[in-house]
Amino acid sequence: MAVTIRGKTLPLPILQGGMGVGISLDGLAGAVAACGGMGTLSTAVCGFQEPDFAKRPFEANLRALDRQVRHAKVLAHGAGLIAVNAMVATTQYADSVRTALRAGADAIVCGAGPVSYTHLTLLTI
């Protein structure tokens, strides 16, 4: 049974969840989307492989998130959707959501705290 989200049909209604540090990266999310599902990247310490992560973790995380969203979309070959899981309770929540949307994420999944994102979703319009 296909599912339609924001006008895009997922022939395989599988939503891969965000799985934290080093698991839900571009390769996994892109592969799930390429099969017709929704692949999800996690914002949790996503820049840990960046060379300057120890000295500039905030910038490294946002740079890595941007790159991973863009690369996952390439790996998906136009199929499926790419989502980003952002924990509300983190200090980087708003910046992570903005970065993900600007990079082309199709959806944002929020958890770990009270949600206040209405003003951020206007970036997609």
What are these regions (language model features)?
Residues 1-106, 115:
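N-terminal capping/small domains of soluble enzymes
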Residues 118-124:
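Conserved small/polar residues in nucleotide/adenosyl-binding loops
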Residues 112:
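Residues that line or immediately flank small-molecule/substrate-binding pockets and catalytic motifs
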